Swiss-Prot record:
Species: Parvibaculum lavamentivorans (strain DS-1 / DSM 13023 / NCIMB 13966)
InterPro entries tied to this protein: NA-bd_OB-fold, Rib_uL2_dom2, Ribosomal_uL2, Ribosomal_uL2_bac/org-type, Ribosomal_uL2_C, Ribosomal_uL2_CS, Ribosomal_uL2_dom3, Ribosomal_uL2_RNA-bd_dom
Subunit structure as annotated in this protein's UniProt entry: Part of the 50S ribosomal subunit. Forms a bridge to the 30S subunit in the 70S ribosome.
Disulfide bonds: none
Protein name (database record): Large ribosomal subunit protein uL2
């Protein structure tokens, strides 16, 4: 889908670039596949802010998307492509031969009327899903599982994809968009193709209100706060903060490594940070 560039008919329109969604379905989602969604406003069960700068935004209903794709060897026809406010990618409504409906992540080049299928050995075409063990090496995939049966976790955002670069001793070697190379069990499912809406990265928000519609509140820098509010706060006139960047609670940020899961380090063949060292 193309980008829409708006003429500066008002200050808010100036610079506005959005994705053209005219080809998507304009009605409401399937009621049986939707759930209510309560806003948290960044608060936890105690009512305390655990994620700052969130709140407000347009009301949403949650679309139940099938990330597992475990209905083997049952063809499904793509009824329509839909917008989903809960993710950057588009979703596709598919209808199985027995009449059951489901939402799946829409890959690029998937059109209404196409037939998708998941199974142990199926055609390598966008929207089909099968275990990594049977996908040809070099194939572009998305919605990749990390544990068999858990459902896809890798490459689900708009325009993302993973390349299968090899297989070894029951594991598949994947190259992620970040540059990381990692192993996952070859019995994990993956869907063929790259995720839809690749132009999402080219959107220009153009006004503060549009971010508020998305539930994002203003992100205040620590350096403009008072000393009581942030370690970078205070000072006469504009200051640089005077120390290495820290969070409001004094922990190093901007480049500080936060990965703590040592148990899965052995599956990471190449770190995403290696490319930066050059």
């Amino acid at each position: 889908m193309a980008l829409k560039k708006y003429k500066p008919t008002s200050p808010a329109q100036r610079g506005l670039v959005l994705v053209d969604r005219s080809a998507l379905y304009k009605g409401k989602p399937v009621k049986d596949l939707t759930e209510g969604l309560t806003k948290s406003g960044g608060r936890n069960n105690h009512g305390r802010i655990t994620v700052r700068f969130r709140g407000g935004g347009h009301k949403r209903s949650y679309r139940t998307v099938d990330f597992k794709r475990r209905r083997y060897d049952v063809p499904a026809t793509v009824e329509r492509l839909e917008y989903d406010p809960n993710r950057t990618a588009f979703i596709a409504l598919v209808k199985y031969e027995d009449g059951e409906l489901a939402y799946i992540l829409a890959p690029q080049r998937l059109q209404p009327g196409d037939v998708v299928i998941s199974g142990s050995r199926v055609d390598v075409k966008p929207g089909n899903a099968m275990p990594l063990a049977n996908i040809p090496v070099g194939t572009i995939v998305h919605n990749v599982e990390m544990k068999p049966g858990k459902g896809g976790q890798i490459a689900r955002s708009a325009g993302t994809y993973v390349q299968l670069v090899g297989r070894d001793q029951g594991y598949a070697l994947l190259r992620l968009s970040s540059g990381e190379q990692r192993m996952v069990p070859a019995t994990c499912m993956a869907s063929i193709g790259a995720v839809s809406n690749p132009d999402h990265s080219n959107i220009t928000i153009a006004k503060a209100g549009r971010n508020r519609w998305l539930g994002k509140r203003p992100h205040v820098r620590g350096v403009v706060m008072n000393p009581v509010d942030h370690p970078h706060g205070g000072g006469e006139g504009r200051t640089s903060g005077g120390r290495h960047p820290v969070t409001p609670w004094g922990k190093p940020t901007k480049g500080k490594k936060t990965r703590a899961n040592k148990a899965t380090d052995k599956y990471i063949v190449r770190s995403r940070h290696q490319k930066k060292k050059g």
